[in-house]
Amino acid sequence: MDKTLIRRRFAKAVGSYSIRADVQRQIAYHMADAIGKYIPSGGRRNVLEIGCGTGMFTRAFLHRATPERLLLNDLCPEVEPYLTDLLANKRIHFAASDAEALNFPSGQNLIVSCSAIQWFDQPEKFLAGCRKLLTADGYLAFSTFGPQNVKEVVSLTSDTLPYRSLKELTDVLSAEYQIVYSREEKLKLSFASPLEVLKHLKETGVTGIRRQSWTRGELDDFCR
């Protein structure tokens, strides 16, 4: 995974992400609700969020919880100006880094990541490694995308991430964690035209692994 390219694409999309990322917003709200339901308040004291972006999930979470300390992380330092309202709170801090290095303080009660780990080189290794950062009774909560994500575009370009199925993830995680909740859901977006699809992907940074621009032939094929 070219992290430099991914960072550059998301940095370019940071201004439009919060407006255009409709699916990610739905996921963020559902995940925040699930954490409130399945994780006791004592498990939300010291929190680490991986891949916070512009704070979409963060704000949803903070409407439902009041952690004593919240460390926000993202690959892109360019997101920090979009977090200024959150960082005005002395309990909340931001650090830009590649989260896969797992260079974070231990003693976390909760590690969360919303719609981010699909961009990791070794998501399973990262998720297993989070165990050593958690307290003995700590929780790991995350959402990601599955193999059916943007399949219409993938069928044409073959540009795709190595998405994991829910079963693949639960099989791996069962060795390190007791799974208290898992869910898979298909969310559908409709667009007025094929070009609107591509615009949406660009404005949400989802073109992060494609190195070249679309050719005229690819564009014509996609629009048919």
PLM segments and residue spans:
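Conserved alpha-helix/loop element of class I SAM-dependent methyltransferases that forms part
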Residues: 22-43
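A short acidic, Gly/Pro-enriched loop at the edge of an enzyme's catalytic core
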Residues: 100-111
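Conserved catalytic/acceptor-binding region of the Class I
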Residues: 137-196, 205-216
